């Protein structure tokens, strides 16, 4: 079985690594996607376990098409009862790169017409359309050479919908992007993890699921459960195996935010994900926060001043850089920002720059190596002001 796994720009490599770990074959990174091959068990495991995939599509058939009418007639020849039953709802997502098919909505409508007309002809009745929450979702793609590909969506809701988000806050980070950032940073749970601008807690939760070996899809359902070839015994066995793979916390995962509402949302999301034993959150400014001793990993997504109002965005980034230099000795710090001018005010030279997209915003994901030599020391090599101050660690209680 061939699979096409969609992802975000910049995450193709880490997604390919995930698929390899799951046992996929013939893995090929593409633009915002990775293709591979595997059996039904791989399809189920991939939906359950992938952290950096958005949705998993199964190619069904393809054909050359020259016009809308030819598309309709070709689709009328398909036995749609193999994929859809009369009592089920369905939806069509259409996308075209062909100069002959410029209107995606019209393509979706034409495809829908062909399907319902086939059912009327064969059964005298037709299934209903549900664009928001269908039982079966089809994808039609027409490339620049007018090759039409028809695919079944095995995921249903996008895989970023983990099932733990109670509410997102002002500008929530996409779960797939958050997991991808952690994968790109190379954090594996063997060091403290800190987000000093944690917002609704997405990075913290994704980090906890990684270190706890908890599948991100454990709290939700999938479209393949509505397919006619759904193997309930196989699926229940895979879920049972996944539940038994959970690991206890290894290192502290700590989030800080100065906004009371953000901390409450983060606490609710953490509770919904059942990860209270993995994560500590604290209401504090990042200027006052003291992390566990390094080595450690910090990943934060500071405001861009594009959707969130800040009084002085350049000053904010300078303060972030100052705090990193002062208190995060031995850490690898990663910052994602869509404000490239403000990012320059961090005042540190990035050792790595990765281009990512946060929604429609072009961002850079910068890595900063915070060596001990960059920190002002006293006679014994210790920051004199921080010598006697307590640091938030695994045993600390959240505020």
Language-model regions: role of each:
Residues 2-136, 146, 154-155, 160, ...:
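Accessory substrate-recognition/RNA-binding modules or partner subunits associated with SAM-dependent
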Residues 79-83, 288-294:
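Short amphipathic alpha-helix with an adjacent loop that forms part of the alpha/beta core around
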Residues 139, 363-367:
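Conserved hydrophobic/aromatic beta-strand scaffold that supports enzyme active sites
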Residues 150-184:
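SAM-dependent Rossmann-like transferase core, predominantly class I methyltransferases
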Residues 173-291, 306, 314-316:
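Conserved S-adenosyl-L-methionine
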């Amino acid at each position: 079985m061939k699979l096409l796994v969609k992802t975000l720009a910049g995450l193709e490599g880490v997604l390919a690594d995930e698929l390899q770990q799951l046992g996929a074959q013939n893995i090929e990174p593409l633009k915002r996607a990775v293709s591979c091959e595997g059996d039904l068990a791989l399809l189920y495991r991939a939906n359950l376990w992938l952290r950096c995939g958005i949705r998993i599509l199964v190619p069904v058939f393809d054909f050359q098409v020259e016009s809308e009418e030819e598309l309709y007639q070709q689709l009328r020849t398909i036995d749609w009862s193999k994929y859809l039953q009369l009592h089920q709802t369905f939806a069509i997502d259409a996308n075209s790169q062909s100069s002959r098919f410029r209107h995606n909505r019209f393509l979706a409508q034409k495809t829908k017409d062909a399907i319902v007309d086939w059912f009327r002809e064969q059964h005298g009745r037709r299934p209903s359309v549900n664009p928001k929450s269908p039982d079966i979702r089809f994808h039609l793609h027409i490339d620049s050479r007018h090759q039409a590909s028809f695919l079944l969506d095995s995921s249903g809701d996008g895989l970023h919908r983990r099932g733990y988000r109670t509410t997102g806050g002002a500008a929530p980070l996409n779960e797939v992007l958050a997991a991808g950032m952690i994968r790109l940073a190379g954090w594996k749970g063997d060091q403290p993890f800190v987000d000093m601008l944690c917002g609704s807690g997405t990075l913290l939760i994704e980090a906890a699921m990684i270190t706890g070996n908890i599948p991100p899809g454990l709290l939700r359902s999938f479209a393949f459960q509505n397919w006619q070839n759904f193997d309930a015994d196989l699926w229940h066995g895979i879920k049972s195996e996944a539940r038994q793979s959970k690991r206890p916390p290894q290192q502290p995962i700590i989030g800080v935010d100065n906004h009371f509402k953000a901390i409450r949302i983060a606490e609710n999301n953490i509770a919904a994900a059942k990860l209270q034993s993995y994560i500590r959150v604290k209401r504090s400014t990042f200027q006052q926060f003291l992390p566990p001793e390094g080595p450690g990993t910090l990943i934060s997504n500071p405001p861009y001043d594009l959707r969130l109002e800040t009084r002085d965005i350049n000053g904010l980034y300078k303060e972030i850089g100052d705090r990193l230099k002062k208190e995060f000795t031995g850490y690898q710090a990663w910052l994602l920002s869509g404000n490239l001018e403000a990012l320059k005010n961090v005042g540190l030279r990035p050792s790595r720059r990765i281009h990512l997209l946060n929604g429609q915003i072009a961002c850079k994901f910068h890595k900063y190596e915070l060596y001990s030599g960059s920190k002002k020391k006293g006679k014994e090599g210790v920051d004199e002001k921080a010598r006697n101050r307590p640091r938030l660690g695994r045993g600390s209680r959240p505020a």
